[in-house]
């Protein structure tokens, strides 16, 4: 079947066809719809918005009340001997009602929709990339390792000691300047008797105090 579309205007068109095989039914099925959603729907009969029945003795029809500047998808079908139902389809575009009017849009609405979706997707990708970059920068500027109070802390190559560290160092220096005195072992068997040699070698605490020196440090011994 050959389909021809002629006399296309803003809101109408004339459709004519010629078939080599006769139609077994009493009429032809003329189905058409705007092609706005052709990407998302197939060429099914139930997806057509308009359907007209034309007697088989007629080979042309006038379509009216069409939308200006719109792409239409049209199919003609009839029951034949070789094929129960076969669709013959074509496409045509109505004229623009005011192509030279100021402010008129010559862009297809479907193309505008795809461009808008692409812009929104690009904006979302840019925002997501910015958030990931900020998170990566924060992770890079964090200290490599650190410890809490009582330990050494390192941040950006600088070593910081806790506040207790200088006090501990001063206490050790103070203890190093004091003499050591051995205390008797209380829990040992010979704890009651003191070694005379140890008593002779041990300095007199009173003499040290009279001499103005520092008092001796007494170190306890654990019991055996």
Swiss-Prot record:
SUPFAM superfamilies the UniProt entry points to: Fibronectin type III (SSF49265)
Listed transmembrane segments: 113-133
Feature: compositional bias, Basic and acidic residues: 183-192
InterPro entries: FN3_dom, FN3_sf, Ig-like_fold
Topology versus the membrane: Single-pass membrane protein
GO cellular component: membrane
This protein's name: Fibronectin type III domain-containing protein 9
Domain of life: Eukaryota
Residue ranges of the region described as Disordered: 175-224
Compartment list: Membrane
Fibronectin type-III domain location: 1-101
UniProt entry keywords in alphabetical sequence: Membrane, Transmembrane, Transmembrane helix
Annotated coiled-coil segments of the chain: none
The keyword Mitochondrion appears for this protein: no
Predominant place of localization: membrane
